[in-house]
Amino acid sequence: MSLTDPVADFLTRIRNAIRARHQKLDVPASKLKAEIARILKEEGYIANYKTTEEEGRAILRVYLKYGSNNEAAIRDLSRVSRPGCRVYIGRDEIKRVQGGLGISIMTTPRGVMTGRQARREGVGGEILCEVW
């Protein structure tokens, strides 16, 4: 099965796993998905992630994070830039997500980073998604 938007599929799988209270989820691996998972781990939204190989295919295993009252660290995820409607912004147009309580994940000429990092480094790029 070919996907037209693998990042949206990745975010949807995370959203569905959180709603079903799963501890982990497996998705087909890619470099971009691994970078998104790295940022989510650095920002404290997931517990961990690792890339493994099963049946000859690369798998990205994401371990979700829940609080003491079984509340997920991720409240919601939304895809911003889509294959049919790319959203590019300059360094001066980067806005805070949910009043600073969330993050935006961007691809820039310097790699995948949060909107906060891009603002600090003075680079713009494509907004992939927002997480809060």
From Swiss-Prot:
SUPFAM superfamilies: Ribosomal protein S8. The keyword Coiled coil does not apply. It holds the Pfam family Ribosomal_S8. GO terms for molecular function: rRNA binding; structural constituent of ribosome. Keywords: Ribonucleoprotein, Ribosomal protein, RNA-binding, rRNA-binding. One of its GO terms (cellular component) is ribosome. One of its GO terms (biological process) is translation. Part of the 30S ribosomal subunit. Contacts proteins S5 and S12. One of the primary rRNA binding proteins, it binds directly to 16S rRNA central domain where it helps coordinate assembly of the platform of the 30S subunit. Belongs to the universal ribosomal protein uS8 family. This is Small ribosomal subunit protein uS8. The gene is rpsH.
